[in-house]
A protein has these predicted regions:
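Accessory alpha/beta interaction modules
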Residues: 1-96, 164, 196-204, 208-210
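Glycine-rich, flexible loop segments associated with nucleotide phosphate handling
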Residues: 38-41, 73-76, 102-108, 122-129
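Coupling/switch segment of ABC-type P-loop NTPase heads
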Residues: 85-90, 94-115
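Short, charged alpha-helical interaction segments and adjacent helix-coil junctions
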Residues: 1-10, 83, 107-210
Length: 210
C-alpha cells in the first residue's frame, strides 16, 4: 500500500512544490521514526477548485528555488500532481464512484456558468463532508448553515441544497431591504439589489451574516 494525501486549493500558489515536499518529507520521516521494515511510498496530490483559470503556477521544485550555476544537475527535482477539478472531462468525472463525482460536476458547471444552480438529483451519501467541502472551496458559508439546521435526510441531493440556498438568499435579501427602508436608505436598497459585494457588506453591517 501507499500513503496518500490531498491538499485542497482555491487559488494557485507559487511555492506549492515546497509545501508538498515538506508534507511528504514529514511523512517519510515519521515512517523512519516508527522503524518500518521498509517505508512505503507517499503521494500528496493537489485538488485545485478554482473556476476562473487553470493552475498556472510551478509544479516542479527546481522552478521555485535558486540554484547556483553549475549545480543544476546535482539538485534533485520534485514534481507535484495537480488536478484542475473544474476542467475535468465527462469521461474523467464518470470514473468517480464516490460523492466526489457530485462535487466535481458542481465545479465544472460553475466554471461554465458563475450563476449555476445545481439540478443534480444524485443522492449524496456523506452530506456533512460534501457541504463542508463546498463551503470551504466556494467561500459560501450558507452550506455550513444548512448543516446546522438540516433534518436527517432533508438535504441529500444537490438540487435540494440549491433550492434551500435560493430560499435563504431571498429571505436574507428581504430582511435586508426592510432594514434599509426602516433607516430611509433608499440608495442602498438599489445597491443591495444589484451589487453582490455591497449586499454582503450590508448583511454584515446589520448582523444578518457574521
Amino acid at each position: 500500500f501507499a500513503i496518500y494525501g490531498m491538499e485542497n486549493q482555491t487559488l494557485p500558489e507559487k511555492y506549492m512544490p515546497l509545501r508538498i515536499l515538506g508534507y511528504d518529507g514529514a511523512s517519510y520521516r515519521s515512517q523512519l521514526q516508527k522503524k518500518r521494515k521498509r517505508p512505503v511510498a507517499v503521494l500528496t496530490i493537489v485538488l485545485y477548485f478554482g473556476t476562473d483559470k487553470m493552475w498556472d503556477k510551478p509544479t516542479h521544485l527546481k522552478d521555485v528555488i535558486y540554484i547556483p550555476e553549475g549545480l543544476g544537475e546535482y539538485v534533485n527535482d520534485y514534481k507535484i500532481t495537480v488536478f484542475n477539478i473544474a476542467w475535468l472531462t465527462e469521461e474523467e468525472i464518470a470514473r468517480f464512484k464516490s460523492d466526489f463525482k457530485i462535487v466535481a460536476n458542481f465545479f465544472v458547471y460553475k466554471r461554465k456558468n458563475k450563476d449555476y444552480v445545481s439540478d443534480d438529483k444524485t443522492e449524496i451519501k456523506h452530506v456533512d463532508e460534501v457541504l463542508k467541502l463546498l463551503s470551504a472551496m466556494t467561500g459560501d458559508e450558507r452550506y455550513e448553515e444548512i448543516l446546522a439546521e438540516k433534518e436527517k435526510g432533508e438535504y441529500n441531493t444537490m438540487d435540494t441544497v440549491a433550492e434551500h440556498l435560493v430560499n435563504m438568499g431571498e429571505a436574507r435579501l428581504g430582511k435586508l431591504i426592510n432594514l434599509l427602508l426602516q433607516n430611509n436608505r433608499i440608495e442602498d436598497v438599489k445597491k443591495a439589489s444589484v451589487d453582490k459585494e455591497a449586499r454582503k457588506k450590508f448583511y454584515k453591517e446589520f448582523g444578518i451574516i457574521d
